[in-house]
């Protein structure tokens, strides 16, 4: 399997507080990494470092065979003043994907003309997850992807992520919930000083 990413001796601090230090791991195509830890342990910071949105205090991230990374964080990155359909039109959609299948599965097909600001939190979360479903990325980085989702939507998400692994894509996600996805684990509570 091809190596997608390697973290070498990563450390991250905010002011004087060390969130984690000396963290090293590799991720290969078709593998998943579940990041665990208590609130404030640095899960979101680690995912942002992996995505290139935040710099580590120390250490490096090496990316191999990675042309595109898709990050979905707590803030859903949707344009609140646009409709769901307008937000979708801003994406580079993989041409082999039938958008209508995902809209129907996520129960968004009747909400295309609704402004994002008028959606519930769960509906906004599902709209943001469309980025993952429609994007042709080598590495999917998801920060608490199940927060705000109902059971059916969680099952759809897990099924999709399992399919992505089979398609040789790499996954990194944080979740307080156990997800039905075969993955390795990093517990940030065990890599702090």
Segments from the language model and where they lie:
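Conserved ABC ATPase "signature" region
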Residues: 97-112, 133
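Hydrophobic anchor residue at the start of the ABC signature
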Residues: 129, 168
